[in-house]
């Protein structure tokens, strides 16, 4: 959908949508790139696309591009305005724990999978937080076998909201990420992007 210069290739996108009209389409990308290079480009072109039959999975947050950040509700609302996209899901994950993502449910909560767990820890002594108590996020996965990525203490703050009782009906722990810890080094996909462009 983007050129090598990260410009929206509107003609290519429109052609793709015409070829796959009536079919379910999966869109995947980094949150900030979808916002900057897809949503904003459509607004500047004053064009609309029909993505009402698509699902968007996005992640990576805003990190260094905080000045561009919008709330999840606004992100959803604006994308629906320009392209009818309403099936939008965020995820939480990191390259250090490849293969393990925590998907957002229709209620806006992130969920641990069958193969993963999430724990929040108190910053003062690293003891486990109670449900509803913010803490440092630890992610656990049984997937990594070739490197020690099975248990990672992140630099993110989150809160576990509950277990087996999410209104969406999914079982397991569900949680929210509140942001980076104070004084945490900002790094990730948006850093690579910001450094390059």
Where are these regions (language model features)?
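Active-site glycine/GP-rich loop and adjacent strand/helix microenvironment
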Residues: 1-197
């Amino acid at each position: 959908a983007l050129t090598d210069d990260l410009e929206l290739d509107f003609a290519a996108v429109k052609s793709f949508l015409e070829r796959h009209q009536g079919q379910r389409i999966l869109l995947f990308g980094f949150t900030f790139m979808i916002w900057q290079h897809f949503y904003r480009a459509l607004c500047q072109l004053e064009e609309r696309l029909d993505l009402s039959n698509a699902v968007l999975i996005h992640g990576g947050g805003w990190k260094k591009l905080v000045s561009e950040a919008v709330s999840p509700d606004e992100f959803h609302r604006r994308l629906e305005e320009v392209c009818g996209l309403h099936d939008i899901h965020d995820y939480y994950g990191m390259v250090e724990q490849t293969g393990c993502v925590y998907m957002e449910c229709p209620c806006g909560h992130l969920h641990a999978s069958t193969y993963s767990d999430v724990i929040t820890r108190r910053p003062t002594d690293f003891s486990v937080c109670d449900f509803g108590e913010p803490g440092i996020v630890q992610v656990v996965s049984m997937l990594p076998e070739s490197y020690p990525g099975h248990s990672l203490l992140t630099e993110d703050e989150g809160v576990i909201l509950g277990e087996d009782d999410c209104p969406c009906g999914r079982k397991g722990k569900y949680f929210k990420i509140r942001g980076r810890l104070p004084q945490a080094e900002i790094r990730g996909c948006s850093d690579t992007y910001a450094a390059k462009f």
